[in-house]
Amino acid sequence: RVREDFNDGWRFHLGDVPEAYSAAYDDSGWRELELPHDWAVEGDFSIDNPSGTGGGALPGGIGWYRKTFVAPENEADRVWRLEFDGVYMNSEVFVNGESLGVRPYGYISFCYDISPYLRWGEENVIAVRVDNAEQPNSRWYSGCGIYRNVWMLKTSELCIPSDGLFCYVASMDMNRIDRTDRKSTRLNSSHQVLS
């Protein structure tokens, strides 16, 4: 299991660009940046912004993030999972033009298996559309964008997934913890078991 920081080398554009999901889209004119990133704090404070004073009086909107990287051929036997610690809000993630899914709202981490969409030994493009245009949507300043870290998790096909192992405590007080025999484990496998 290898967990790599995936925050460097992103490009950003504030505004909706419907064709930006495509791997062939030319993002060379976009701003280069490192994540985490919040585009709202780069805007002007104004009570006229749709978020209102309860949302920090900062602008919302729609933004796109893109990153190009090479997936080495010698790692094609690994499962690659793209992990987002936080994106606010209503994000959709694409790999090489294929939508992996939509994450509504934005206060929870999420992960996608990108292995089936990778081009081994070639350039790959991740595109993330973030939609925080519908304002106000919270009672405090929420930010806009990929506001937490992004990770690339590489594992073998047979592995214990993140958050897949749990330990339980039967009872606990200030002086003592009683163990329990209750255990829970999940196992990821892309292999079929035949009997």
Where are the regions a protein language model picked out?
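Accessory beta-strand-rich segments of carbohydrate-active enzymes
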Residues: 4, 14-16, 60-170
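Accessory carbohydrate-binding/adhesion or oligomerization-edge regions at the termini
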Residues: 1-47, 51, 125-129, 133, ...
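Short, solvent-exposed beta-strand/turn "edge" segments of beta-rich domains on protein surfaces
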Residues: 54-60, 170-178
